[in-house]
């Protein structure tokens, strides 16, 4: 039997609206989802006050055919502050759903269904105003577009989650609300 494969052209959708990126985390012991802040944080920002901040990114109109071959995929983020503390560890995963909406609140963010595929990111130092790419997330994107219900033009959510960073170790990136031209970008080839 023959399996059809779909060739990919390079696409680069950016987060295109205020409600499509945000940070989720614990603040003073309670959950918080902030979608209108200018800064996206990954890590443990303030000792004893904020833990496990993660970034949630929703890319709309992702024009990848169902079942397409994914050669390379990354996310480009723009540094908002210069952060060079060592030890930031993050895990990147996707939302295992067809055309997902951005979560309405912290509880909905915590309930998102993870892809089986993940990518580890030992995040290097970030310089304000400079772009940084994640490691390859090809297997994550491939798992999403291989879903039976996936269709070209749907939305895709990717999450960059703090994975045990020490207190005071974090990275700051621009959100759509900070400057739309600096919004996170999904790169797929």
Task: Identify the residue ranges that each predicted region occupies.
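Ser/Thr/Pro-rich, low-complexity mucin-like regions
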Residues: 143-180, 189
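Beta-strand-rich interaction/scaffold domains
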Residues: 79-152
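Low-complexity, serine/threonine/proline/glycine-rich extracellular segments that form mucin-like
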Residues: 63-72, 86
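A short beta-strand element within beta-rich, extracytoplasmic domains
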Residues: 59, 69-81, 186
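Extracellular/periplasmic catalytic domains that process cell-envelope and extracellular macromolecules
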Residues: 50-51, 69, 83-85, 149-153, ...
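Extracellular fibronectin type III
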Residues: 1-6
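Flexible, small-residue-rich N-terminal segments that precede or flank a structured functional core
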Residues: 7-63, 96-102, 107, 111-122, ...
């Amino acid at each position: 039997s023959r399996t059809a494969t779909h060739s990919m052209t390079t696409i680069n959708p950016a987060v295109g609206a205020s409600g499509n990126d945000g940070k989720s985390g614990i603040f003073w012991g309670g959950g918080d989802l902030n979608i209108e802040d200018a800064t996206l944080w990954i890590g443990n920002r303030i000792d004893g006050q904020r833990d496990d901040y993660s970034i949630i990114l929703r890319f709309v109109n992702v024009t990848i055919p169902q079942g397409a071959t994914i050669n390379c995929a990354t996310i480009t983020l723009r540094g908002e502050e210069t952060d060079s503390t060592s030890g930031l560890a993050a895990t990147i995963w996707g939302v295992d759903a067809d055309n997902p909406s951005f979560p309405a609140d912290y509880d909905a963010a915590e309930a998102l269904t993870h892809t089986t595929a993940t990518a580890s990111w030992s995040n290097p130092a970030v310089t304000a105003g400079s772009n940084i790419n994640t490691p390859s997330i090809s297997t994550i994107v491939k798992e999403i577009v291989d879903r039976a219900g996936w269709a070209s033009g749907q939305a895709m959510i990717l999450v960059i989650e703090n994975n045990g960073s020490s207190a005071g170790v974090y990275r700051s990136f621009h959100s759509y609300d900070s400057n739309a031209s600096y919004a996170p970008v999904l790169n797929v080839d």
